[in-house]
Structures are given as C-alpha cells and as structure tokens.
Swiss-Prot record:
GO biological process: translation
Family listed: Belongs to the universal ribosomal protein uL18 family.
A single GO cellular-component term on record: cytosolic large ribosomal subunit
Example of a GO MF term: 5S rRNA binding
Organism for this UniProt entry: Solibacter usitatus (strain Ellin6076)
Gene designation: rplR
Functional description taken from the UniProt entry: This is one of the proteins that bind and probably mediate the attachment of the 5S RNA into the large ribosomal subunit, where it forms part of the central protuberance.
Entries under Pfam families matching the protein: Ribosomal_L18p
Disulfide-linked positions: none
Keyword annotations: Ribonucleoprotein, Ribosomal protein, RNA-binding, rRNA-binding
Entry protein name: Large ribosomal subunit protein uL18
InterPro entries xrefs: Ribosomal_uL18_bac-type, Ribosomal_uL18_bac/euk
Known partners and oligomeric status: Part of the 50S ribosomal subunit; part of the 5S rRNA/L5/L18/L25 subcomplex. Contacts the 5S and 23S rRNAs.
Length: 119
C-alpha cells in the first residue's frame, strides 16, 4: 500500500536537506526558526561548538503577550536581532527550518534584518 506522507515528515526531510548544506560558525552563526501552531521560536546557534548563543520566543516574558501570529514573529525577529547585537553578532546564516519563506517566517527574517542583522 502507498502510505500518505505527513506534512511534518515532509518538512523534516526538507530541513535535513537544508542542514546538510548549512552550518553556523562562531563568526557567522545560524539563525534557526521553529514555528508551532501557537508560538514562534528563534535561536542563534554556533554549530561548531554546539551552543545556542541567543534565543527568543513568543513564550518568553518579553514576547508572551504577542501570541504566535505575524505581529509576534516581527517582535521576536527584532528581539533576537537586538540580543545578537548585544553579544557582538552582526552576521548570521538564516535557517528557515524546512518551512516556506512566507508569512511568520518571512516576517521574523525581515524584522531581524531591519534591526541590523545581516544575512
């Protein structure tokens, strides 16, 4: 029988394919995005060390009242960029996490760019 491939499994395949080609370094870490139904999360990761350098999410006390919509994604993008700049990070590699570059993911990326991150 042919089994139906679930959306989550397809996204994970795409994400693995992206991650094969994409890696963050200390000079240019990876800005990873995770999108759930209710919230959005962003992390700046140094893959060489295996460490999260900066993170922000709509669950944080700074972004809690925003929810998981496009406005929240913009706020989280701005917040993660500000936190990264405080740590001296100016340039990142964007990892969309297998999601389409549209809607909340695009809003987060645009807000991070406007706040001063380069990618």
């Amino acid at each position: 029988m042919i089994r139906k491939i679930e959306k989550k499994e397809i996204r994970n395949r795409i994400h693995r394919r992206i991650r094969r080609k994409l890696s963050g370094t200390a000079e240019r870490p990876r800005l990873a995005v995770f999108r759930s139904v209710a919230h959005i999360y962003a992390q700046v990761i140094d893959d060489a060390q295996g460490q999260t350098l900066v993170s922000a999410s709509s669950v944080d006390k700074d972004g809690k009242s925003k929810g998981g919509n496009v406005a929240a994604a913009k706020a989280i993008g701005k917040l993660v960029a500000e936190r990264a700049k405080e740590k001296g990070i100016k340039s990142v590699v964007f990892d969309r996490g297998g999601y389409q570059y549209h809607g909340r993911v695009k809003a987060l990326a645009d807000a991070a760019r406007e706040a001063g991150l380069e990618f």
